[in-house]
């Protein structure tokens, strides 16, 4: 009986972990990936990234409210590669929800608060521009970033569902890929302010990197060391608010161990663990200044 209970517990634990991983993997597959090599030189392409979605979140309790996200995101854009190391993209990004034709006319950081007055009709529209330069193992991106689930952030640091609610990340990004090291560093400028503005400047700085400590050879074992960091800043010197500077830091370091087999049923197993830390460098958004956790 004890063995049966342990087996059931193990299956349930694996199911919960697999459900979380499946959601992350799903949003990662839905996110456009960086692949300059697939673009022919001096050829003009018309691409349309289209995503239709219906996501229902039902919660029981007082911690979070339930909500439903029915809609679509469209990004039609032209792509041109004038040189082997350079590609340019220009287009439009549109976010639409079923059941409404009015969208608040300001930056979307999550499910936005309706303020009335200033709004767009039909869809939440934004210009789309991306310049990508590839120099050896490094790739530099200016404009619309390869963002959201593309960064590979773990769930405690980033909610993949943001792909359905937030504006595309815009700013500057550096991607590095070597034989044993992968890095993604970026700054996402979320809110620009004018002189005497009524809201704060907002941007997020992030970094993910992974070092391959053990490569899967004949033994099938792979070991990686992932390090991740997110810094969110709210402030500015031109705004007309009394909120002060707000700076929140979250980071993690972990280990990922993977074993592969040549088997029809069980061909891979993976376990990972991360140590997380939080630090409120400035402001009073959190009721505490530091924190730590395991995931």
PLM ranges: what are they?
Residues 20-121, 127-133:
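Beta-barrel outer-membrane channel/assembly domains of diderm bacteria
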Residues 57-63, 100-107, 152-159, 195-202, ...:
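Outer-membrane beta-barrel translocator domains and adjoining extracellular loop/strand segments
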